Amino acid sequence: NSLVIVVGGRPCKINVHRSLVLLYNSSSLLCSGTLINQEWVLTAAHCDSKNFKMKLGVHSIKIRNKNERTRHPKEKFICPNRKKDDVLDKDIMLIRLNRPVSNSEHIAPLSLPSSPPSVGSVCYVMGWGKISSTKETYPDVPHCAKINILDHAVCRAAYTWWPATSTTLCAGILQGGKDTCEGDSGGPLICNGLQGIVSGGGNPCGQPRKPALYTKVFDYLPWIESIIAGTTTATCP
């Protein structure tokens, strides 16, 4: 299940997640994504599935609000040089909406970063993923948590299989308790713009010294800008 949860967070205030996008199909909530301009959403490549739709402007999954908008993917782009057999390799996907969305009380794009985050930075994560690391408890409204950018060495120690590359971020709380979890995949890591995309992590979530892995958006900016500008053959770092 590609959904990740925010464990140890609290319900997000209604005005802080205007860029958060819900990816879903007929049977389930799949992932989150982030609106980066009126026509484009950024999410994780491992969130791709056949017939998904996107909802923007959602707060409670159960209670519809007048600002909600539904969109379909018009085009989807993943890195052409992504390893097919490695789910976390270049875990980034750009989606062009079938038609643009307008800014509203609950919908607004999030800016891309002008510089990468430094170790120790405090960032926000958010999503509709599981809110218990042991039970299948999913919230109606997205949960938010503050976590820290950690040194790559922490993730390398936690996940020996992980080829810690410069194009990923390691983030969490060393003592555990706050983390992204099942259901949050593809969602944002936010500090001075969209710094990361939820990619993978420990199971169960929120364990001490088992932070999560995030695709480092800053390193993909040239690719993102090329695709949006129409150069669809651009390769990724």
From Swiss-Prot:
Known EC number: 3.4.21.-
What are the positions of the active site? H46, D91, S185
Q: How activity is regulated? A: Inhibited by PMSF. The amidolytic activity is also inhibited by benzamidine derivatives.
Q: What is the role of this chain?
A: Snake venom serine protease that induces platelet aggregation through activation of protease-activated platelet receptors (PAR1/F2R and PAR4/F2RL3). On F2R, the cleavage occurs at Arg41-Ser42 (like thrombin cleavage), and Arg46-Asn47. In normal condition of hemostasis, the cleavage of the Arg41-Ser42 bond liberates a new N-terminus that functions as an agonist. However after envenomation, the cleavage of Arg46-Asn47 bond degrades this potential agonist. This may explain why the snake protease is less potent than thrombin in causing platelet aggregation and release reaction.
Question: Per its UniProt entry, what is the enzyme's top EC class, as one word?
Answer: hydrolase
Q: What else is known?
A: Negative results: does not have fibrinogen-clotting activity.
Keywords attached to this Swiss-Prot or TrEMBL record, sorted alphabetically, are:
Disulfide bond, Glycoprotein, Hemostasis impairing toxin, Hydrolase, Platelet aggregation activating toxin, Protease, Secreted, Serine protease, Toxin
Tissue-wise expression: Expressed by the venom gland.
InterPro entries in alphabetical order: Peptidase_S1_PA, Peptidase_S1_PA_chymotrypsin, Peptidase_S1A, Trypsin_dom, TRYPSIN_HIS, TRYPSIN_SER
Report the locations given in the UniProt record: Secreted
* Positions of disulphide bridges: C12-C144, C31-C47, C79-C236, C123-C191, C155-C170, C181-C205
GO cellular component terms, alphabetically, are: extracellular region; secretory granule
Gene Ontology terms: biological process: proteolysis
Q: Which Gene3D superfamilies match?
A: Trypsin-like serine proteases
**Pro-peptide positions on chain:** 1-5
Quote the protein name from its UniProt record.
Platelet-aggregating proteinase PA-BJ
